[in-house]
Regions:
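FabD-like malonyl-/acyl-CoA
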Residues: 81-84, 283, 599, 663-720
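Flexible catalytic loop/linker elements that gate and position reactive groups at enzyme active sites
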Residues: 128-131, 149, 216, 427-442, ...
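Acyltransferase
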Residues: 412-413, 417-422, 654-664, 699, ...
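Acyl-group handling in specialized metabolite and lipid biosynthesis
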Residues: 10-19, 193-202, 645
Length: 720
């Protein structure tokens, strides 16, 4: 070293250091002044807009903070930060870095640009859904395995079917009384997303449900909302109409009705009676400045990407019934091109008014018996259904490196259009065949390695045989044995979910691959004779059976989804690769564990505690360390919290069932400091408890002791 070139150490800080939380009260004071509220009434974690903020008031916030803190700020503060906590973190980074913090996009761009993965396999790392009779993939699978029919009469909280029912087709009337319906499509935890109650009330329930499913999906993948903030996540949502918007139009038309000259000739009693009858039969809603934005279809993914600060592609897809399977294809391709590091894909469809039933009845497309009899001799039309499903995708290699839960692997997918057919709503078997055949050739796959096909099958006498013929024709060149591939359709269980139909079939297949069981095909007393299964590679499952696979082969399924207008999608999905069994190094390293749970409200936290207890009672084989780690590290930190120290799953169940949440909600995370004590903190026997209680600790200490024994007069194990 050349001594003259060394500089003396500076005793002054090169720049001021701001700890987390340093600006909280100053920011809250500014917000209070601009919003006209007392500071104590402004939570640190609630968004500015949800408390009555506007764009003009946001500019006032920016100016007031510059005056208060004596620093220059840009509009980035308003764009990147919605809460006091986020503004505090931003300002702390700005002070500590001596300039504006890099945007999330700048932080991520270097990692993603040019990181496409070619034609690589794509992993499914999480799924979330709401289907008729099921609010989770696990409940959905249970229903499928039991052969449950989740179709029933139109609920009274939708519309009174008796007001519209006619056994014969008649314009404006409905001849099908049944459908697959969600229990509560209107429920929404607005506070969790910082959305005001007034705005939530006018928002399309499809937007609400997708936001909640994305939140659930992230946690099912093993991440917290904070960990996904600002990342290049793509969002692709299949969605068509918005039946909730009809209520907004009805409200507007109800107001317009009062301006009619003829209306003014009625008595006040008659006018009131008409207004009340209108409200009862057609429904009315409130109003909000964001009403239009909150009900546009493209805003389902766009609002969600904005809410979670996702920076990847965000788009709504409408190819009718094939929409949600098409989103999976687009999402996988987007990942392969490097447009996003991971992607969320799926679809949603709700039936909040009778309108779709009225038009489908006019087209005589529905089942008059209200029974979804896919592949059956008595098939007489489709039964509408509603639901939503989303999955998270990631390159398989990256998912394995990151330790993500790989549920299945998307091997290949393709889309095309029928071109000419006998009618705009009629399928073209040749178009379907061409897609299927070309996909296997292009990806060097063989249908002979597929053991199950999840068909589009809707329960029509002509459509089902047409699809089977297209599959049979496409598979012919590979010489499959007759009746060697099982075939089914989830529409028999939950109805035809239109834009969400494909994702329902996809989630069914992934669950079946995970459990290595093929579920039964219900509502088939005798197969449609036009199918001629005995002359094809396909057969129906009357009961659930183990998923057969040849030695050295992987379980594979194919999925069909076809849309009105001719957009077809076909996909091949494979079971997840086997994970290495847990070795001794992965055994628990401590006798006791700390677990923390949080929620937006105390009631939600208590519900979460009971739900986790119920889950552990059913799945007691989950390692306690994994359960605690997931809840501690991969869950979004919310204000109301519960903590416990536990040494077994059974002990944890008891504490969850009887425990009491912390008395006061946490407004923000406290600042932390680390201390390194140096010498003088050691003492004889300091490792005895760990040595006696933890095999992994004991094994490594014994190895160290044996290594030093030739050079010491005593054993290390005797000291510690």
């Amino acid at each position: 070293l050349e001594a003259p070139s060394l500089e003396a150490p500076s005793l002054e800080e090169p720049f001021p250091v701001a700890a987390p939380g340093a600006f909280l009260e100053k920011i809250r004071g500014v917000w209070a002044e601009v919003l006209g509220r007392p500071p104590a009434a402004i939570p640190y974690n609630q968004s500015f807009m949800s408390m009555g903020g506007t764009s003009l008031k946001a500019i006032q916030i920016l100016g007031a903070l510059e005056d208060e803190l004596h620093i220059e700020l840009t509009h980035d503060l308003l764009i990147q930060c919605r809460t006091i906590e986020e503004m505090d973190s931003y300002l702390a980074r700005k002070v500590n870095m001596g300039g504006n913090p890099p945007s999330a996009g700048e932080r991520q761009s270097a990692a993603v640009q040019g990181s496409g993965c070619g034609d690589a396999a794509i992993a499914v790392i999480a799924m979330a859904c709401r289907f008729p009779g099921a609010s989770s993939p696990e409940e959905f699978w249970h229903n499928l395995l039991q052969g449950k029919d989740s179709i029933g009469e139109v609920p009274q909280d939708r519309w009174n079917i008796d007001d519209y029912y006619s056994p014969t087709p008649e314009f404006g009337k409905i001849y099908c009384r049944n459908g697959g319906f969600l229990d509560n499509p209107y429920g929404f935890d607005a506070a969790l997303f910082g959305i005001s109650g007034d705005e939530a009330a006018v928002m399309d329930p499809q937007q609400r449900i997708v936001m909640e499913l994305v939140y659930e999906l992230i946690e099912r993948a093993g991440y917290s909302r904070q960990q996904m903030n600002g990342r290049d996540v793509g969002l692709f949502v299949g969605a068509g109409g918005n039946s909730y918007f009809e209520y907004h139009l009805n409200t507007l038309n109800r107001m317009n009705l009062q301006s009619f000259d003829s209306f003014s000739t009625l008595t006040s009693v008659q006018q009131e009676r008409i207004m009340e009858e209108w409200k009862r039969k057609l429904g009315v809603t409130g109003t909000h400045p964001n009403l239009l934005v909150d009900n546009i279809i493209n805003m389902i993914p766009a609002r969600t990407s904005q809410e979670f600060n996702f920076k990847g592609p965000s788009m709504a897809v409408d190819t009718a019934c094939s929409s949600s399977l098409v989103t999976l294809h687009l999402a996988a391709d987007s990942i392969r091109r490097g447009e996003c590091e991971s992607a969320i894909a799926g679809g949603i469809h709700l039936m909040l008014t009778p309108t779709s039933y009225q038009y489908f009845s006019s087209a005589e497309a529905l089942s008059p018996t209200g029974r979804s009899s896919v592949f059956a001799a008595d098939a007489d039309g489709f039964v509408p259904g509603e639901g939503a499903g989303l999955v998270m995708l990631k390159p398989l290699e990256q998912a394995l490196r990151d330790g993500d839960p790989v549920l299945a692997v998307l091997k290949a997918s393709g889309i095309n259009n029928d071109g000419h057919s006998i009618g705009v709503m009629a399928p073209n078997p040749d178009g379907q065949r061409e897609l299927i055949e070309s996909l296997y050739i292009r990806h060097n796959l063989s249908p002979a390695d597929v053991q199950y096909v999840e068909a589009h099958g809707t329960g029509t006498k002509i459509g089902d045989p047409s699809e089977v013929r297209a599959l049979d024709s496409a598979f012919k060149r590979w010489g499959l044995l007759r009746q060697s591939v099982a075939i089914g359709s989830v529409k028999a269980n939950i109805g035809h979910l239109l834009g969400a139909a494909g994702i329902a079939g996809f989630i069914k297949v992934v669950m079946a691959l995970q459990h290595k069981i093929m579920p039964p095909q219900i509502n088939v007393s005798a197969p449609n004779p036009m199918l001629k299964f005995e002359k094809t590679p396909f057969y129906l499952l009357a009961a659930a059976q183990e998923w057969p696979v040849a030695e050295g082969k992987a379980r594979r399924a194919a999925i069909n989804s076809f849309g009105f207008g001719g957009t077809n999608s076909h996909m091949v999905v494979e079971e997840a690769p086997a994970r290495a069994s847990a070795g001794e190094a992965e055994q628990p390293v401590r006798a006791k564990h700390v677990i923390g749970l949080s929620a937006q409200t105390e009631h939600a936290l208590q519900q979460k505690m009971l739900e986790l207890a119920a889950f552990l009672e059913q799945h007691g084989d989950y390692p306690l360390a994994d359960v605690c780690y997931t809840e501690n590290a991969a869950r979004t930190a919310l204000p109301h919290r519960f903590h416990a120290v536990t040494d077994s799953v059974q002990d944890l169940i008891g504490k969850l069932q009887t425990g009491v949440p912390a008395a006061a909600p946490v407004s923000h995370s406290p600042a932390m400091a680390l201390m390194f004590t140096g010498q003088g903190s050691q003492y004889a026997g300091m490792g005895r408890a760990l040595y006696d209680g933890l095999p992994a600790f004991r094994k490594n200490v014994d190895a160290c002791s044996a290594a030093f024994e030739p050079y010491l007069d005593l054993k290390l194990t005797d000291l510690i």
